[in-house]
């Protein structure tokens, strides 16, 4: 199947005027599901960081990070409009569906990017703003425009963009980067390949049709399955590092170990999956559990922190 370059073509014939795009269409352009994970992990970084931040400033910080994440999503949809129109899971996005013009999405994304970075710098901290600006640049220019269509390691390197939010949240409070914030970064960074390669396995045909060189399409199912197990193990190890490094309790460590074993267990299910299995049930199960894993790990860190504050320092 040939992919048409829709950066100019998508939405041009019979395209709606700006006034015809609803607020919901623009909200969908922000990738709200992805944004929810970004906001949650950034919030975790902000809460777990030592020190105090004014609640209003903290809210402003999280809002700016959310807007920056949404801006990245809008710019990603602008650039990927051609392949989004072909893939079933993305064909209903606002640009390929003809609800928003590509140039509108570009202007929207650039405006929100600048707004989020400037406000975060002025209201909170310029290091945090710099990290947010770098994250937006890395996701849009490095991952979306370069890596995604050029190498099967796209998600490994590009996954760094999704791992920065807790580090940004941490920097909003402390004005710096620490070992703890790097560990939070690593948990997400190492989690990303197994999560997305599980998706790539059961969407292999669609990625192949649009020319995106995902690991299963370039290196085959067997290699992808082995790589998934390796990254699942690394993710499980990184998940217990907060306890090993002394900034989370043994209770958290026990829960993180159980979650990590579950993650590895699901990855082994993918490894045992027969070659050419069209149903890809183990891959779908791993993909679903990986989302649960990440939310559970960061939730456990927050609960562990709250218990420690109440036990040792009174009511938060």
Swiss-Prot record:
GO process terms (BP): heme O biosynthetic process
Compartment annotation: Cell inner membrane
Catalytic reactions on record: heme b + (2E,6E)-farnesyl diphosphate + H2O = Fe(II)-heme o + diphosphate
Single annotated GO MF: protoheme IX farnesyltransferase activity
GO CC, alphabetical: plasma membrane
Pathway field: Porphyrin-containing compound metabolism; heme O biosynthesis; heme O from protoheme: step 1/1
Membrane topology reported for the UniProt record: Multi-pass membrane protein
Enzyme type, top EC level: transferase
Transmembrane parts of this sequence: 34-54, 55-75, 95-115, 118-138, 155-175, 182-202, 228-248, 250-270, 287-307
Matches recorded under CDD domains: PT_UbiA_Cox10
Protein EC: 2.5.1.141
Keyword list, A-Z: Cell inner membrane, Cell membrane, Heme biosynthesis, Membrane, Transferase, Transmembrane, Transmembrane helix
Signal peptide annotation: none
PANTHER family registered for this protein in UniProt: 4-HYDROXYBENZOATE SOLANESYLTRANSFERASE, PROTOHEME IX FARNESYLTRANSFERASE, MITOCHONDRIAL
UniProt family annotation: Belongs to the UbiA prenyltransferase family. Protoheme IX farnesyltransferase subfamily.
Anything else known: Carbon 2 of the heme B porphyrin ring is defined according to the Fischer nomenclature.
Functional note: Converts heme B (protoheme IX) to heme O by substitution of the vinyl group on carbon 2 of heme B porphyrin ring with a hydroxyethyl farnesyl side group.
Protein name: Protoheme IX farnesyltransferase
Organism in which the protein naturally occurs: Sinorhizobium medicae (strain WSM419)
Source taxonomy: Bacteria, Pseudomonadati, Pseudomonadota, Alphaproteobacteria, Hyphomicrobiales
Primary gene name: ctaB
């Amino acid at each position: 199947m040939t992919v048409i370059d829709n950066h100019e073509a998508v939405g041009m014939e019979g395209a709606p005027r700006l006034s015809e795009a609803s607020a919901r269409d623009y909200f969908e352009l922000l990738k709200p599901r992805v944004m929810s994970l970004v906001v949650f992990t950034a919030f975790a970084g902000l809460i777990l960081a030592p020190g105090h931040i004014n609640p209003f400033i903290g809210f402003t910080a999280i809002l700016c990070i959310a807007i920056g994440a949404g801006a990245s999503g809008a710019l990603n949809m602008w650039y990927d409009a051609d392949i989004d129109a072909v893939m079933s899971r993305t064909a209903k996005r606002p640009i390929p569906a003809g609800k928003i013009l590509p140039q509108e999405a570009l202007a929207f994304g650039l405006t929100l990017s600048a707004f989020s970075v400037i406000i975060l710098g002025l209201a909170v901290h310029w290091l945090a703003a710099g990290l947010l600006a770098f994250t937006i640049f890395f996701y849009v220019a490095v991952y979306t425009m370069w890596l995604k269509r050029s190498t099967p390691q796209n998600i490994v390197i590009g996954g760094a963009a999704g791992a920065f939010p807790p580090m940004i949240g941490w920097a909003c409070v402390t004005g710096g980067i620490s070992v703890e914030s790097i560990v939070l970064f690593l948990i997400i960074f190492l989690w990303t390949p197994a999560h997305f390669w599980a998706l790539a396995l059961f969407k292999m045909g669609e990625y192949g049709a649009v020319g995106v060189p995902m690991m299963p399409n370039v290196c085959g199912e067997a290699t992808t399955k082995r790589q998934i197990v390796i990254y699942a193990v690394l993710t499980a190890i990184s998940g217990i590092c907060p306890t090993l490094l002394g900034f989370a309790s043994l209770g958290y460590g026990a829960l993180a170990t159980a979650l990590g074993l579950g993650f590895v267990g699901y990855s082994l299910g993918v490894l045992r999956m027969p070659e050419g299995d069209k149903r890809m049930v183990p891959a779908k199960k791993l993909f679903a559990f990986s989302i649960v894993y990440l939310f559970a790990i960061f939730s456990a860190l927050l609960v562990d922190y709250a218990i420690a504050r109440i036990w040792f320092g009174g009511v938060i």
